[in-house]
Amino acid sequence: MRIKATVERLPGGMMLVPLLLGALCHTLWPQAGSTLGSFSNGLISGTVPILAVWFFCMGATIQLRASGRVLRRSGSLVLTKIAVAWLVAVLCAPLLPIGGVSSGPLAGLSVLALVAAMDMTNGGLYAALMQQYGSSEDAGAVVLMSLESGPLISMLILGASGLASFEPQLFVGAVLPLLLGFALGNLDAELRQFFAQATKTLVPFFGFALGNTLDLSTIAHTGTSGVLLGVAVVVITGLPLLLADRWIGGGNGTAGVAASSTAGAAVATPALIAGMAPQFAPAAPAATALVASAVIVTSLLVPLLTALYARRGDARSG
């Protein structure tokens, strides 16, 4: 049976299919973890420890050595995306309830969902698109995008926009696994290769554990708003990223379009933020479902738009 190939036909499938299975498990048997206990409970409720290992392994993949041009290109994209997410948070905070919109086509939408969906790029998708439509320097820009992994950037944005305050040790705790992995990966290339193998392996495990915090009714309730959020991510972050790539990064804009996606790891951000800032707890389940939808929508739209933009540029140069 070609289970893996079938699952991967869905954009972000290795994250989203286990997430849906976890949500199904939680909907049909909410007490499964506490009833089974032991290792089964660890798989069902172990979102944070599984993600901690994933962040460590992700940190190990970040290489210290990169050319100035690559750092300029990746830095312009990362900083632009963070700035856009911060601006959206500032503008939308007075308009949206802290617990999210309760009904209508924007049901579940919250500042937490917006920030989580907009501040983290799908690095794998970006690298694949740049290998096809960009240069090696474009593809190398993924080196700094790995720093967006985890809740740290969302914490900084929510704190800078005045929506939350976090104790200093929480920032340290959020970034420490990534830094430890980064240090080991740069001290020993063999360790970097060893830990890098686990980054993809752990994805379905934290997807399943995260799904066990959701109810299928929540996912159904936020269906329309999830699609709208995905489109909004591409539109709202795409244009500034395109301009930043052209004016700051020295590219032709293709890399900017390719970076206007939502990373699969962003699905975990609402729950992690809610664990540190309880005022976001009511918004977290719906925000998780919304971000999961945004992952799918952006994974479908971004490759199409990147291809169209790249071909348009080729036609002009030709």
Swiss-Prot record:
A single Gene Ontology CC term: plasma membrane
Entry's localization field: Cell inner membrane
The keyword Transport belongs to this UniProt entry's keyword annotation: yes
Catalytic activity: 2-dehydro-3-deoxy-D-gluconate(in) + H(+)(in) = 2-dehydro-3-deoxy-D-gluconate(out) + H(+)(out)
Main location: membrane
Record's keyword terms, sorted: Cell inner membrane, Cell membrane, Membrane, Sugar transport, Symport, Transmembrane, Transmembrane helix, Transport
Membrane topology reported for the UniProt record: Multi-pass membrane protein
Listed GO MF terms: 2-keto-3-deoxygluconate:proton symporter activity
Signal peptide positions (record): none
InterPro entries linked to this entry: 2keto-3dGluconate_permease, 2keto-3dGluconate_permease_sub
Pfam families (alphabetical): KdgT
TM annotation in the entry: 10-30, 42-62, 82-102, 109-129, 139-159, 163-183, 201-221, 224-244, 257-277, 289-309
Family: Belongs to the KdgT transporter family.
Role played: Catalyzes the proton-dependent uptake of 2-keto-3-deoxygluconate (KDG) into the cell.
Protein name: 2-keto-3-deoxygluconate permease
Organism of this sequence: Xanthomonas axonopodis pv. citri (strain 306)
